[in-house]
Amino acid sequence: MKHSPDRLFARPLAEVPDFAFNEDVARVFPDMIKRSVPGYPTIVENIGVLAAQFARPGTRLYDLGCSLGAVSQALRRHVKSEGCRVIAVDNSPAMLERCREYLHAQDSMFQELLPVETVEADILALALEPASLVAMNFTLQFIPPERRLELLGHIHHSLLPGGALILSEKLRFSDAEEHGLLGDLHLAFKRANGYSELEIAQKRSAIENVMKPDSLEEHRQRLLAAGFRKVVPWFQCLNFASLIALP
């Protein structure tokens, strides 16, 4: 499928609105996230690889905050356990509509993929069924901080023995020098990918009120408080990381 280049913040805006996963963002999202999140393609593809180690036959695999379904597609490519199915959940109608188009395109190119169900829902209100794998790829950071432990508790409760949560997030750092250095390097990554200073500044203004990153230690302690017994970081590139949490 074709997507448009991300030029959402290329012109000066009199007032920068809060970032939202609307039709404008859905249209450019593949370009936006590839140019904004270092290591994103590696994270997505390897979530599929890792998921294959935890998926159990006849169980659900959740992609919570699925956006355009990149993780769902990776799960379908890599998980071969018989009877598994992917549940892709997002609360944005615009994102989910395009997600369905991408999944349909995947179906037309490959045979014997896992079945996938798309669900428009708020994951905070979603009744999670038993699952062997839950993936949240840059989703928790958009959940109100006071609701994050509650959500992780629900996920922990839903996971079957031998299952796992794979959680990817942007990080902040308690050490000011480390936080500043990795922040500056992330800006350099964006510039190298063609974003102007205006685009970077306006995107930051749009997203700073809706995305609240945590530190790696905050993630670890919250996951343990939610009932997970082990938290293992498996990937980090600059200030973006992915963790495996075992129930």
Swiss-Prot record:
InterPro entries: CmoA, Methyltransf_25, SAM-dependent_MTases_sf. Keywords: S-adenosyl-L-methionine, Transferase. It is an enzyme of class 2 (transferase). Its EC number is 2.1.3.-. Gene3D superfamilies: Vaccinia Virus protein VP39. SUPFAM superfamilies: S-adenosyl-L-methionine-dependent methyltransferases. One of its GO terms (molecular function) is carboxyl- or carbamoyltransferase activity. It comes from the Bacteria. S-adenosyl-L-methionine binds at Y40, G65, C66, S67, D90, N91, D122, I123, N137, R204. Pfam families: Methyltransf_25. GO terms for biological process: tRNA wobble uridine modification. Homodimer. Catalyzes the conversion of S-adenosyl-L-methionine (SAM) to carboxy-S-adenosyl-L-methionine (Cx-SAM). NCBIfam families: carboxy-S-adenosyl-L-methionine synthase CmoA, PRK15451.1. This is Carboxy-S-adenosyl-L-methionine synthase. It comes from Azotobacter vinelandii (strain DJ / ATCC BAA-1303).
